[in-house]
Structure formats: C-alpha cells, structure tokens
C-alpha cells in the first residue's frame, strides 16, 4: 500500500502520500487579526495617548496629563448585539491628571471615553449588528529609498527619498549636468548644498570635508553661489528654502528656521515610527556600505593607537565582523559643530570612512554614516540627512545599491491594531485643539478634566473608520473558507495605499520575496489583480509589520539540517541561500546529494550543499490556505489554480456536505481556525448534548456551556447552521470539535460533494463547459442549500398620524390574511408566495375635500377605510419560502430604535434551493461550468456494474486549460471510493504518478483507469473507453434564482424618464447604440421606433399605449422621447436658440416638466428607496403621473 495513515482530529483518518517530514505545525490561521488587536489593547492605545498628551494651554500654566485607561464589561453579549443591530463594544474609561503649574494643584479624574468596538474570538467585529472585518493593508515602509533613472541620452542619474510615517518628504536627485538638487515636500528643487548650509555647515571647504571631493559636489557648489553678501551663507540658504516652501511670503531666516524644525526635527509633526528609524539605520549603517570595498586609510583604535585594518585591505564580511565592536563604538566618529545661525545648533556626530572608488582605484571616496541614533529618535536628525546625501553621492561612484520598492523588505503590513491606533490618534489630535482652547478660556480654579475634554472627535473618528473605511469590510461569509481567507487578506488599496488606476504592472506582479510570505496564486481576477493578496500559510508578522516566513536552520559546521526554526523577513533572507523543502536528507539529517536546488535573492538554481544556510519548512509555505486546499496543484496551470482558489470561497453551504475523498490534509486546520465551528475551550467530559447546546464538565468540576447556532442568516444570505458532533459521555480535549459549522463534516472543511463524474460529450449539451447532471442529485438533495432572506417593516409617526401594524388591511380578502396573527404579522412556519402579506400595515392618508353628502355618510357609517392606505410588507419577486422566524422590536420592550420609529418587525424567510439548470458548478481546479440539462437517472450513462454517472463534463475543457490536476483527482477519487478510504495529497508533496497507479491497481480498477460506459437510453456501450471517477464538485453562489429577472411596469429615472437598470431596481434591459445599429442594418424601422419611444421615454405615448392595450384599441402614434427634450433644454441652457419644427415648419411645443410631476418617478441615485418601494408596493405603482 502506498502512503501512510494520518489522523485529523478525532473523527477522520486519511491516507497521506506526503513524504516530507514537517517539523513545524501551521500557526493559528487568524492570528494576524487577533494578535494585532491584542497588541493594540495592551500597548498601542497607551502609545497613542502618550504621543498626544500632555497638553498645555497657550500660557503654559495648566497641563493635562494621561495616567491610564481601562475597558469595562461590554454592554451587550455577542448574540444580543446581533439581534439588536448594536455594536459589540466595551466602554473605555481614561484617567487624566490636570496640573495647575502656578498653584501646584492637581486634579485626577476618570473620564468616559466612548464605546470601543471589541474583536470577537473569531477575529471579526460586530458593528450595528453586522459582522465586519478590518483587512490588513500592504503599504510602503517608511525609510530612505534610493533609485536610478536613465535619461533620454542614456545617462544614468540617481535619486533618493526619505519617506516618513507622517510628515514631509525629503528628496535628492541629479540632473543632466551632474548637479545634485534637493526637494522639500515636493516643492521646487534647490542645490543640495543649500540645505547643508542651512544645517550650519556653510563653508565650501567644510562641505568638501564632510562629503569628500567629488565632481557632483564641486559642480553643485559652483551652481550654489553667494548672491547676497550682507547675509551669512546660512541665513541666505535658509531664506532660499523658505521661498521654495512658502512662495510669496516675506522671508526671514528665523521664520525659515522654525519652519524647517517643524517640518523635519519636531517629533510631533514628523514621525518615522519605529520601523522608519530601523530602516534608516539599517540602510545608512556603515557596516553594510563598507562590505567588499577596499579601505583607503588605516583604521586606528582611538584609545590604544593600534592599527585595526591597514589601508588597501578588502573589507570582507569576516574583516568587518572582526572590528564590529569598534565600528559600533567610537571608530572614525567625528563631531561637527554647526554655526550659530543653523537650524539645529547641537553638535552632529558622523562616522566617516575613506575607501577606493570601484570605478577608479586612484580616487578616494568618503562614506558618511549617521552614527546610528537610538531607536527612540522618531524625528529626522541632521546626521541622517548628511548620511543620506553621502549614500546618494556614493551611488555615482559605484558604492551602495538602489532599492526595489516592490521588495517585501520595503513593503510592510498595517494590521488592525495599527490602523485603529492611527484613527484614534487622528481623533485625539482633533480633541487636543479643542482642549487647549478650553484650558485657555476658562477659569483655572474650577476646571476639571471632565469639563475640558470633549470625546466626540475621538468617537466620531473610530465610528467613521468602522463604518465607512475602505478597509472595514462586510465579512465574506459564504462559507468558513471565505471567512478565513477574508481575515488573512492583504490589500494594497485604501487610505495611504495605492489606487487601482495608478497601480502599474510591477506592483501587481509576483516578486521573489513573496515566497512563503504572500500567495502567488490567490488574488482576484480583474482590476484588483495583484493589489489584493493573501498571506501564505506560514506567514507571520514581526514587530515592525514585515512578513516573516519560517526556515529550518542548517548547521554549517556539521552540514546537518536541524529542527531549529528561524523566522526571516525578506531583507534578512537576501543574505542567505535557502534549499527547497523536498531536498533529500540522510538519516543523520545531512543532505543526501552534493548539489541541491535552492534560492538566493531572485535566483533559483543549483547550489553546493555546503553553501546552504536554511531549508524550507514545508512545501505548502509558498501558498495561501485556499490554494493549499487544491489537490494536485502542482499539475495545474497557475491561471486556473487562481480560479480554483477563488471559487472555493464562493461555495454555498449544502444541507448534507461531504468532505472530499481526495483532500490535501489542509481541510481540518482550515475548518478548525475559521471560527465557524464550536471548539472546546477546556478538557472535560460531555454531560449533556442536544441540537442547541452542549455541556462539558471540567476536571475541576466547573461546567462549560457551548451554544450551537441553528439556521442563522449569514452575511451572504446562506444558512449558518452548526451540527453537534459529540454525545453524552464523550471525553473532549481543549481544541476538539464540539460542533461542525456550515460546510463542514466531521471537523473537516466540506464545501461540496463527491459525485461520480465522466469526461464525455452527450448530445452537445456540455458545449462550452456546460455541465450535464443526473436527476438523482436533485431528488436526493445532494446539492440542496438553504437560503435565508430578511425583510423588515417599521411603523413611523407621519404628519397625518402614526402608521399602524394591523390585520385590518383595506381592500384585501380574508384569503390573503389567513396566515396573519391578530396583530397582522405572519405566523412562523407559514408558506408564502410572491405578493403575500408578511406584515399588515396601514398609513394615514390625507383627507380629500369631500362633498357634503359624502361627509354625512362618513359621519353615519364611520367608514374609516377611506382614511388609510395599505403599505403592508409583501413578499417580493423571487422571495417565496417558509417563514423561519419573526422578531418584533418596540420602544415599550426597551429596544433601541431610530428616532421616529415606533415598532420594527423583522421576518426571516427560508428557501430550500435544489440545483437547477442555470446554476454554476465548479471543481477545485478552476473548471467551472453552468448546469445545462438535468437528465433522468435512467437516461444517464452507466458503469458496467450498473452505477449511473452523476455528472458529465466536456473533455475539451482540459487540454487547452492545462489543469491536469482534475484528471488525476478523478482517478484517485474513484480508487478512494472503491477502497472506502479518504486520501490526503498535500500540495507539492502529494501522490506521484506511481502512487496514483498503485492505488488504482489496489482498488481493482483497469490499468488505464478508464471504463466502458453504456448509454442509459439504448443500453449500447459507447465506442470508446471513458475516464470516469469521483471528483469533488461544489455549487457556487451564482444561482439562477438570484439572476433571473423580468420587468413589467416599473420605476423610471427622474431626468431622462427612461426605465432604471438592474434587478434590484426592477429595471429594464438596456438597448444600447450597437443594438440600435443592428436594427438599422435590418431596416426594422417600426421595431426601432417603438423601442426608442413607447418602451423607453415617450412619456405620453407609453401611457396611451398602455391604455390602448388594456382597452383593446389600436395603439396611437408615438410622440417625442423625453431624452430628446432634455437635449433641447440642455442646448437652450447653453444659450443656443434651439427650436424643433415639424414638416410644415411649425414649431413643435415641448412640454415643460411640471411641478409635482415626480411623485412616483424616481431618481437613478435613489436605489435604496427603490428597493423599499419595490418591497412595499405592488409593481403597478409607477405608472406615470400623467394619468392623474
């Protein structure tokens, strides 16, 4: 037997074909969300407060200090928040200290700081009752970047940019004449020496002393002449910079100094963040810059006078390591004191080394380092600016290297915690201005922290972020895999990121640093391709937000691949050589072969085993979770694998899902970490178990109660239904499954079913990827899913009186009310069809002026039916089903409702949707198709043992698409079915061809794994042998019931008077210009005329046509289309005298838009209202207003 048995949880064993021994388990798959939020609660929030506070008033007599904060218990539980449309949030209380510096009086007070949304254990937030996810953002890391560009004459120029986390950019660039310029915050450029002079190093000799002699520096000094002898060079430079930054304002050296300090050297205005300081120190560090250069001076220990390195020595890694302590100490450190007019007058410490130029050995080049400021220094220092300039000047001498901005060492992740901290900081900064004013205006004696703090800006910033930020998204809840994928998504879009239109090809492309960090497969098709990515299965964030991936360390001394795990970021990995996970190893852990396949920077090639530093942990570390669920991924073309990974996320949860016969072993972990299952929190013994709750007694005697969710509506309108797995007496351990979630079976992800599939054509019904299906799959509910739709009706106070929910609906027979209770609300369990009343509701109607006789009759008979109109909630088109639940919210019960709403009724309708023609099906290899025909079981082709085939796919869908994995899955699936086993074939480490054929033979199948099939209609065998097997097929969320749409009379757009578009608006079909050309080409003038008039926007014509049709009269001639009238009016509005004449040269009167005519036409933008209107009123309401 090929393969070995592996247990997945307590309920499933699979035969695995993996050969690689994995030394590291997968991390928790949603830790990117949960860890980040926990960091925010523990340290991030405190840092934000400490950044903004203390706040002093303008006279500096009062100061508000931050002491601490604490979160109290959330107001609602998770379930209550869902039911009440509330947010799951906890109140935060902050303690402040108000110090009066004149009297020394201190007031300490705890201030309520609003409700802060709390992340659930599943990594989601509940905002206004809906489950949301904050997607992590992929942004350019703060730091210093160098680039090169070739001009039109083929000359190479260099540029550099310092990008802070917040603050102004500082850029350097060279021009065609070899002069170096700087730009401050994207303004006009000035010679870079001007900035150096402003920093207090004004003499030409001083500048040459700092940077060393070079053509670039000399050219720039020549360009930068002393224009105004009455000013010192520093003052003149400062004025010149001020003129660039604030053109047109009176320039003085003092104002320029304060401006520059604010722009770059004030930590409140300019923030590199910890990551920016780390990147700058790393890039400008002299150790990396000296590597492999030839030193041009003796390096002497300043204390002992000992020569450490002699001139002419090549600075190899070993040489640098030998003097590392000296470099980190005081070796070649020089102190420069700026002149008294400088922006910053503190002494500047630089570290300088002289090396030979790689381009000209006779030339000496100076390398200036920033002497590595402390990590706590978040603003720029003059040393940073001078060291950046030095690196920039060195580039043209061939020292240093330019940066690749798509390298994952230069892109980092802003996860939830950081995004929230940034929003909170924005809110606090707004609050700060407010506080400062109040502190200055009010009387110091009576002030308390409570009085001067207004929390509205803070709560508004947080609310706005959760409610409307591009990164706060409604959770994709089609199935557990889509939830998990959504939580691990990395988006380059969003505030501070890229935009779709500006993102070029390079940003979207796969980069070698994605290996083990970002999945090269899972990304959307279409405009977002490559901008939205997914974290690879082992990916993990370090404290700076760079993605790390794990490797096994190789002991270079013994050549043994150890089990020690090292996590590397992309730029750390660049220094090493990494071998693939499938490198063959001996028993003692050394490489079995002298030459191994490996990677170093961007090169995939063979390396000598002795030069390898690390080995991949697992073959699946390259890909994301969804991709790792595709068996035989290595045999699929990547374009189709992308579709396969994306389509698994669109699978609809079925009534009775089955885990795949051929899996990858990833199904268990994905289901476990998705948050959709009920997982045991502690060890214990099950003492009670039913469909809705499970009780587990812990060893210490305490009781854990687990609630099992039944048929809750998910965000996608599917049934979120959990099924209990354990029974009384079972022993459970922490982390075991207590209940399966939707799309799970026995603790494994189960998105679809295992039908018997044949690759064959049948009467042309599987042309163009169509799928032919057996009626068995319909009758036995194999692909049946439950969908829940929510409808709501609210009663408000109107000018004419309150709306009422009642059974007394005017002009409706008893038949329509049979399922309503005495309040007029539908009973649970009722079967409803389109147009049935769900909630009877009446709205007061304005009294018309009645005649005296009518008023008399009213007074006598009290006929109230005239005074109200029926605004009941009815079942919309396509909404029929069974009422699953009704929820009623009223003020009397203490429910929070919007202002003006007295009562809210929600009705949930469940639909059982069987698979039907027009539904979309797919395999896991990107092989998708639409069901084209459902054939009776007796007519389906059958196997020699009489088993009818379930699905027929077109064999032409395989060769050109190059997704051969589906055929291998088909054969292995058949063998698994015959043997009664489940199989795991992990990606890049799965069943080989031999394993496949061995298993096929073991299952007693023919040696080519094909079969003779018999035609179910005639009983004759088909001419050729057919590939038949078991393939995992899923039903996708694109169902024909949601897409089928037909319009009768419906709403029209306000301006053009043309029908709206789209199913949601009950719109019409667009007849565009190309369709018009087609009719013109056929000369179908009458058809064309009625399409352009009656059926579109001839307002009077369509009313008359409607009337004529209902009365059986001939249809009158059409009039002028509304859009033509709009065109005429628009031309007139431009001042053109535009008139329309008939054939007798008489002017045609174009009707004017009357006031009050838009009662029941609608504006294209009011789509939401359109939906409500469609739900509440029958389709006939939007006849046009002319008939009144």
UniProtKB/Swiss-Prot annotation:
GO BP, sorted A to Z: DNA-templated transcription
Keyword line: DNA-directed RNA polymerase, Nucleotidyltransferase, Transcription, Transferase
GO molecular function terms noted in the UniProt entry: DNA binding; DNA-directed RNA polymerase activity; ribonucleoside binding
Matches recorded under Pfam families: RNA_pol_Rpb2_1, RNA_pol_Rpb2_2, RNA_pol_Rpb2_3, RNA_pol_Rpb2_45, RNA_pol_Rpb2_6, RNA_pol_Rpb2_7
EC number annotated for this UniProt entry: 2.7.7.6
Reactions mediated catalytically: RNA(n) + a ribonucleoside 5'-triphosphate = RNA(n+1) + diphosphate
GO cellular component terms, A-Z: DNA-directed RNA polymerase complex
Region of interest: Disordered: 1149-1188
Stored InterPro entries: DNA-dir_RNA_pol_bsu_ext_1_sf, DNA-dir_RNA_pol_bsu_external_1, DNA-dir_RNA_pol_su2, DNA-dir_RNAP_su2_dom, DNA-dir_RNAP_su2_hyb_sf, RNA_pol_bsu_bac, RNA_pol_bsu_CS, RNA_pol_bsu_protrusion
Annotated signal sequence range: none
Biased composition (Basic and acidic residues): 1161-1175
PANTHER family linked to this entry: DNA-DIRECTED RNA POLYMERASE I SUBUNIT 2
Family: Belongs to the RNA polymerase beta chain family.
Subunit structure: The RNAP catalytic core consists of 2 alpha, 1 beta, 1 beta' and 1 omega subunit. When a sigma factor is associated with the core the holoenzyme is formed, which can initiate transcription.
Function: DNA-dependent RNA polymerase catalyzes the transcription of DNA into RNA using the four ribonucleoside triphosphates as substrates.
Protein name, entry field: DNA-directed RNA polymerase subunit beta
Protein source organism: Streptococcus uberis (strain ATCC BAA-854 / 0140J)
């Amino acid at each position: 037997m090929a393969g070995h048995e592996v247990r997945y949880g307590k309920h499933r064993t699979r035969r695995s074909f993996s050969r690689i021994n994995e030394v590291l388990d997968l991390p928790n798959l949603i830790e990117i969300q949960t860890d980040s939020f926990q960091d925010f609660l523990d340290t991030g929030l405190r840092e934000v407060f400490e950044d903004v506070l203390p706040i002093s008033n303008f006279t500096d007599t009062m100061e508000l200090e931050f002491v601490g904060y604490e979160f109290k218990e959330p107001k609602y539980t998770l379930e209550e928040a869902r039911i009440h449309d509330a947010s799951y949030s906890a109140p935060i209380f902050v303690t402040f200290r108000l110090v009066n510096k004149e009297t020394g009086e201190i007031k300490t007070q705890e201030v309520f700081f609003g409700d802060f949304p709390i992340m659930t254990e599943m990594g989601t937030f509940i905002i206004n009752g809906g489950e949301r996810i904050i997607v992590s953002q992929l942004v350019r890391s703060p730091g210093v970047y160098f680039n090169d560009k070739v001009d039109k004459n083929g000359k190479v120029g260099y540029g550099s940019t310092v990008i802070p986390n917040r603050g102004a950019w500082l850029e350097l660039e060279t021009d065609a004449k070899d002069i170096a310029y700087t730009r401050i915050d994207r303004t006009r450029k000035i010679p870079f020496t001007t900035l150096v002079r402003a920093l207090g190093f004004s003499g030409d000799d001083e500048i040459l002393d700092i940077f060393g002699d070079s053509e670039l520096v000399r050219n720039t000094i020549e360009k930068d002449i002393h224009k105004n002898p009455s000013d010192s060079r520093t003052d003149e430079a400062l004025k010149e910079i001020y003129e660039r930054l604030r053109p047109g304002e009176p320039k003085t050296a003092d104002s320029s100094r304060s401006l520059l300090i604010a722009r770059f050297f004030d930590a409140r205005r300019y923030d590199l963040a910890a990551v920016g300081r780390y990147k700058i120190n790393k890039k400008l560090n002299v150790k990396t810059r000296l590597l492999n250069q030839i030193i041009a001076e003796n390096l002497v220990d300043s204390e002992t006078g000992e020569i450490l390195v002699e001139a002419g020595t090549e600075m190899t890694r070993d040489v640098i390591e030998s003097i590392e302590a000296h470099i980190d100490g005081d070796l070649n450190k020089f102190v420069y004191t700026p002149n008294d007019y400088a922006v910053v007058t503190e002494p500047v410490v630089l570290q300088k080394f002289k090396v030979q130029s790689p381009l000209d050995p006779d030339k000496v080049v100076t390398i200036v380092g920033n002497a590595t400021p402390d990590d706590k220094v978040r603003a720029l220092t003059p040393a940073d600016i001078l060291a950046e300039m030095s690196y920039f000047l060195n580039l043209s001498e061939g020292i240093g290297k330019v940066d690749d901005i798509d390298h994952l060492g230069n892109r980092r992740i802003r996860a939830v915690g950081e995004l929230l901290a940034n929003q909170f900081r924005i809110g606090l900064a707004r609050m700060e201005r407010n506080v400062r004013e109040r502190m200055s205006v009010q009387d110091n004696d009576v002030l308390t922290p409570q009085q001067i703090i207004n929390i509205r800006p803070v709560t508004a910033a947080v609310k706005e972020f959760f409610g409307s930020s591009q990164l706060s998204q409604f959770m994709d809840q089609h199935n557990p895999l889509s939830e998990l994928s959504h939580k691990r998504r990395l988006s380059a879009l969003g505030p501070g990121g890229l935009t779709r239109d500006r993102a070029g090809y390079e940003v979207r492309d796969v980069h070698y640093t994605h290996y083990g960090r970002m999945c090269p497969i899972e990304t959307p098709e279409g405009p977002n391709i490559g901008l939205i990515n997914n974290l690879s299965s082992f990916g993990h964030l370090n404290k700076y937000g760079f993605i790390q991936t794990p490797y096994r360390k190789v002991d270079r001394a013994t050549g043994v691949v150890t089990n020690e795990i090292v996590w590397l970021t992309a730029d750390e990995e660049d220094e090493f050589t990494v071998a693939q996970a499938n490198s063959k190893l001996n028993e003692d852990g050394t490489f079995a072969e002298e030459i191994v396949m490996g990677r170093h920077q961007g090169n995939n090639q063979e390396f000598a085993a002795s030069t390898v530093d690390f080995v991949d942990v697992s073959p699946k570390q390259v890909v994301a979770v969804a991709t790792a669920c595709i068996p035989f991924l290595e045999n699929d073309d990547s374009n189709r694998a992308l579709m396969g990974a994306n389509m698994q996320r669109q699978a609809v949860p079925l009534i009775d899902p089955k885990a795949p016969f051929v899996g990858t072993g990833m199904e268990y972990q994905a289901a476990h970490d998705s948050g959709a299952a009920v997982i045991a929190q502690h060890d214990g013994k099950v003492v009670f178990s039913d469909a809705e709750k499970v009780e587990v007694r812990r060893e210490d005697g305490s009781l854990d109660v687990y609630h099992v969710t039944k048929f809750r509506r998910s965000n996608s309108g599917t049934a979120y239904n959990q099924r209990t797995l354990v029974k009384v007496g079972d022993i459970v351990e922490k982390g075991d499954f207590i209940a399966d979630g939707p799309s799970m079976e026995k603790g494994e992800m189960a998105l679809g079913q295992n039908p018997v599939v044949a690759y064959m054509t049948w009467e042309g019904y599987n042309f163009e990827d169509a799928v032919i299906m057996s009626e068995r799959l319909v009758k036995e509910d194999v692909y049946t899913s439950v969908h829940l739709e929510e409808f709501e009706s609210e009663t408000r106070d109107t000018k004419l009186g309150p709306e009422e929910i009642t059974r007394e609906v005017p002009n409706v027979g008893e038949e329509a009310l049979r399922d309503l209770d005495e309040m007029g609300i539908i009973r649970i369990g009722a079967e409803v069809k389109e147009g049935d009343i769900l909630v009877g509701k009446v709205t007061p109607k304005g009294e018309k002026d009645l005649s005296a006789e009518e008023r008399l009759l009213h007074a006598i008979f009290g006929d109230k039916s005239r005074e109200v109109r029926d605004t009941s909630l009815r079942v919309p088109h396509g909404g029929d089903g069974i009422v699953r639940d009704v929820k009623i919210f009223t003020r009397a019960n203490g429910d929070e409702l919007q202002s003006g709403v007295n009562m809210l009724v929600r009705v949930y309708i469940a639909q059982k949707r069987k698979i039907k023609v027009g539904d979309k099906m797919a395999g896991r290899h990107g092989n998708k198709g639409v069901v084209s025909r459902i054939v009776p079981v007796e007519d389906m082709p059958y196997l020699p043992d009489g088993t009818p085939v379930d699905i027929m796919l077109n064999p032409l869908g395989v060769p050109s698409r190059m997704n051969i994995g589906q055929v291998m899955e088909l054969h292995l699936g058949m063998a698994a079915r015959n043997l009664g086993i489940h199989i795991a074939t992990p990606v890049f480490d799965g069943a080989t061809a031999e394993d496949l054929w061995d298993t096929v033979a073991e299952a007693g199948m023919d040696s080519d794994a094909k079969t003779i099939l018999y035609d179910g209609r005639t009983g004759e065998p088909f001419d050729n042998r057919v590939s038949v097997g078991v393939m995992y097929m899923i039903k996708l969320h694109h169902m024909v019931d949601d897409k089928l749409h037909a319009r009768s009379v419906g709403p029209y757009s306000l301006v053009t008077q043309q029908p709206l578009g789209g199913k949601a608006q009950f719109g019409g079909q667009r007849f565009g210009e190309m369709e018009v050309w087609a009719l013109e080409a056929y000369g179908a003038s009458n058809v064309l005329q009625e399409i352009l008039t009656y059926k579109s926007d001839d307002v009077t014509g369509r009313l008359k046509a409607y009337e004529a049709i209902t009365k059986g009269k001939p249809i009158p001639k059409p009039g002028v289309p509304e859009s033509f009238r709009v065109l005429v009016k628009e031309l007139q509005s431009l001042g053109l005298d535009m008139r329309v004449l008939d054939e007798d040269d008489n002017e045609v009167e174009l009707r004017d838009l009357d006031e009050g005519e838009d009662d029941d036409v609608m504006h294209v933008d009011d789509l939401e209202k359109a939906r409500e209107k469609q739900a509440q009123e029958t389709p006939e309401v939007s006849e046009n207003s002319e008939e009144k």
